[in-house]
Amino acid sequence: MAVAMDNAILENILRQVRPLIGQGKVADYIPALATVDGSRLGIAICTVDGQLFQAGDAQERFSIQSISKVLSLVVAMRHYSEEEIWQRVGKDPSGSPFNSLVQLEMEQGIPRNPFINTGALVVCDMLQGRLSAPRQRMLEVVRGLSGVSDISYDTVVARSEFEHSARNAAIAWLMKSFGNFHHDVTTVLQNYFHYCALKMSCVELARTFVFLANQGKAIHIDEPVVTPMQARQINALMATSGMYQNAGEFAWRVGLPAKSGVGGGIVAIVPHEMAIAVWSPELDDAGNSLAGIAVLEQLTKQLGRSVY
């Protein structure tokens, strides 16, 4: 690395970025998320050899929201063939808001990628077809990857999202009309919102996602999570589609595969080296953590890291 990693470096980056807090806006379209303290700021790094670095509010749990879309895709990859998955969802950036209906109708009910709502709902529909208890299975996967046995769903957030789910329900019904949604809409929506309502800390997220930096292998599990090729494919999707319609801007500023969520979290991957998780609840206009992106930008500059 250009700079040797330690907690002091991370603490200094948080100090540099903290003045940005107050310039973004906490997600308020989900009432249960609107009450989160917007001043929170944390970062954690887990290296492929198991070292952990952290600063700020790195151990406070928050709603991971769309970061869970990566995890649901991982579970689907373990139960479906490549052909079965990618005939129902694409691999291209959407360039549209994450909950867009217009593009979906124009493209005959086939979502652009699995990291927007449309694609994630198709993935959840697939999980409903192969798993007897999809929500429990997701908990088992996350607890296993993180090494933390008490990670759970925030049922208040899940309920709040379900009560304000008209647009996602419309997405599901539109895909059903095109033959690309096979199970009960309400059941799949409930699963989807529970996945989004997983509560995890930056430390737990970094430990969970380090397998994507380690060719598909978690650091404390013998069996590979995914194959090296699948890990590379997931990282590629994160690079092109992980930051909503601002993936290009993020690639320019940060240069790493990443996935964000409207809870203010972002997970980024340095292949062969580390997983990084940041959290700051205030969002920019695209729904990405405003200060979180700035933290990652400063970190990659100081470490001299980019996949480009």
From Swiss-Prot:
It catalyses: L-glutamine + H2O = L-glutamate + NH4(+). Keywords: Hydrolase. Substrate binds at residues 66, 117, 161, 168, 192, 244, 262. GO terms for molecular function: glutaminase activity. Its EC number is 3.5.1.2. Gene3D superfamilies: DD-peptidase/beta-lactamase superfamily (3.40.710.10). It holds the Pfam family Glutaminase. Coiled coil: none annotated. GO terms for biological process: glutamate biosynthetic process; glutamine catabolic process. InterPro entries: Beta-lactam/transpept-like, Glutaminase. Belongs to the glutaminase family. Homotetramer. This is Glutaminase 2. It comes from Shigella flexneri.
